[in-house]
Amino acid sequence: MNYLNKIRIENPLTICYTNDVVKNFTANGLLSIGASPAMSEAPEEAEEFYKVAQALLINIGTLTAQNEQDIIAIAQTANEAGLPIVFDPVAVGASTYRKQFCKLLLKSAKVSVIKGNASEILALIDDTATMKGTDSDAYLDAVAIAKKAYAIYKTAIVITGKEDVIVQGDKAIVLANGSPLLARVTGAGCLLGGIIAGFLFRETEPDIEALIEAVSVFNIAAEVAAENENCGGPGTFSPLLLDTLYHLNETTYQQRICIQEVE
């Protein structure tokens, strides 16, 4: 847990331009791992914030015509500042509007990580792909999708699901930790985007080890929280997840991590 230990010591400032539904949960999750979240949205202050921040999360869950230009502006300012961006294209396949905006953003600015479920990432590489919302039940080959997305966008790809896939450079990793309760809590996936950002430490081309650790810390914490005798369902799971992120130790991490490199 080299990266998590560093976070707990250095408290990296992590800027989150995220959706209205999840701001509180995302901020509390980042605080739980030791990061310092700032939910700054104004392009007018971005240049000053980005000089001292360690990463930027952009999550388009509540995209509107009113915030389109702000998102593009802060992404470009982050590029100018050398600040890595984690981009979460929430429900990109649910509407033509979202898909067009996401593609515009990816043409307008360079992001360091694209994080989404298989349907969302597929929508970024296949104009015919559709989905029902933030999740899809369709079986998809996440490794193949991640590799194709990496080839197109030349940026690290994190695909979440029952198993999580990370592709960076010539490496493809499958992770198999987590809990079904994550799908019953709104904003869990959005929090993961924030946690990934917290692990970047101004690395615009992040080491795959940082991404592996970020995803594994989150999912192992979810496993432990779900197994807690006080966890009765989604309502008790959420605070237990935060507590477990706060207390997670090296022994638990090493005992539970389930990782496989694939071709």
From Swiss-Prot:
User: Gene3D superfamilies from the xrefs?
Assistant: 3.40.1190.20
Q: Does the keyword Endoplasmic reticulum apply?
A: no
Q: Does the keyword NAD apply?
A: no
Q: Which residues bind ATP?
A: K115, T160
| Coiled-coil features, chain-numbered ranges | none
Which keywords label this protein? ATP-binding, Kinase, Magnesium, Metal-binding, Nucleotide-binding, Thiamine biosynthesis, Transferase
Q: What is the name of this protein?
A: Hydroxyethylthiazole kinase
